[in-house]
Amino acid sequence: NALLTKDTFSLFNAQRHLIEPLEPEVGMSAIGRSLYGKALKDAFKPLLSPENDNEMAAINSLQVLSLVGNEQSCGILINHADTSTEQRASLRLWASAGLGKTFKTGVLQTQRIIPKAELLADFASREPKWYVVARMFDSLTSLQHVPGLNDIQQSELEELSLQLQTRAL
C-alpha cells in the first residue's frame, strides 16, 4: 500500500524498502527469491491491474519485480510489455526496461532467457510507441551482458541479441 502514495519521498522510501532484500550483497537464495517474488506478485496484483489509475505505483511495482529476476517476475514483466495485454504505454515502457534488468541479474538460466527474449522481439515488432521500442531494444542488447555464463553461452546470447534486434526491425 505504501506504493500507492503520490508523495515522492514516501514512494522512494517504500521502493527502497522493497528493493533492499534483493541487493547482491544480501545474497538471497533462490528459494528466498522465489518466496519473496511470490509475495510481491500477490501484493502488486491490484497495483498492476488496469483498474488502478495510479500509474506511478504500477511502474514502481514493475521496477521492484525487475530486480527479483526469476521466472515468475519475468513472466509478469513480459505480460506488461505486450500491447495485447497492456494498454498503458508507460507500463509497457517500464516492463520492457525491467526485462533487461531481469536478464542481467544472472538468476535466470539461459534456456529461460531465450524464449522471453524472443517474445520481447516479437512485441517490439508490433509496438506503436518508439520510446517503448527503444527500451525493448535496450533489453535485447542486455543479453550481451548476462553475468555468470561460460564463453559458449555468452557467445550464443550475444548472437541471439543481434538476431532478435534485426528480426524486430
Give the residues covered by each predicted segment.
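Amphipathic alpha-helical scaffolding segments comprising HEAT/armadillo-like alpha-solenoid repeats
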Residues: N1-A2, G27-S49, N70-D82, T105-A124, ...
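Short coil turns that connect the paired helices of HEAT/ARM alpha-solenoid repeats
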Residues: T5-F9, S49-M56, D82-S90, F123-Y131, ...
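Structural detector for internal amphipathic alpha-helices that build alpha-solenoid repeat scaffolds
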Residues: T8-L35, M56-N70, A89-L108, W130-G148
